[in-house]
Amino acid sequence: MYLFTGAAIAAAVIAPLAQGAIVNEAVPTWRDQANTVFSGWESFMSGFGGFNVADRSGSFCGCSLFNFGVGSELDADGDIRAGEAGLDVKLVGGQFSTQRLRAVVVNLATWDGCVETTQMKLRLVDGNGAVTFIAPTTLAENNQQTFDDGSIYRSRAYSFDVIDGYLSSGAVTQWRLEFTSPGGMALDAITIDLDFNVVPSPGAMALAVLGVTVARMRRR
């Protein structure tokens, strides 16, 4: 399913945008509740090969982001800019003692390209060691802006639902988010929310779309 939020697409923008901002971020109603995990990245330390620890306030410290796209590097804005081969991102979150994983929501802010649902997957390992890959259930285009220098900003949200139904044991011991991108795209910011409740949280997949206050200017 592909969704467009109201007034999400802007034709041309001259005003600067906050670096590391996710415009109209999709926030699950269960964020910060018991048995949920949140991690976010507003800046990156490594463009290729090294780990990037989640740096957004309130993040679970066990999550790290790696990019293995050949030719990628940190650009002048501190984003991970893909070379011709594109990005090859792995976001890992450690191991768990057979917990049920009900839902996952991912927000991406990118420049000059976007990640399609066919380029993203969630890798799950169950209590029996079986590995399963699943694709996003829905994709929402939450914001798109074209700037006077020709650069294009996009904010997208990807949702995975009823995840434990894909696993033979119904429980997750390991998870990893993986996605690739077209060449030249820059990853500006990312968040991930995971719901580990045995009973689905109220409004398990309800999302609140929040605006963003400009706090830091893009370094262009």
Predicted regions and their residues:
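Short beta-strand-plus-loop segments that form exposed binding edges in beta-rich domains
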Residues: 176-185
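Short, surface-exposed beta-strand/strand-loop-strand elements in extracellular ectodomains
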Residues: 116-129
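Short beta-strands within extracellular/lumenal beta-sheet-rich domains
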Residues: 75-100
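C-terminal cell-surface anchoring/sorting signal
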Residues: 1-16, 203-220
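Extracellular carbohydrate recognition and processing domains
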Residues: 131-166
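N-terminal targeting leaders for non-cytosolic proteins
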Residues: 20-83
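Extended, low-complexity, turn-rich repeat/linker tracts enriched in Gly/Pro/Ser/Thr and Asp/Glu
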Residues: 96-100, 110-118
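Extended extracellular/luminal ectodomain segments enriched in beta-structured repeat modules
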Residues: 96-105, 170-172
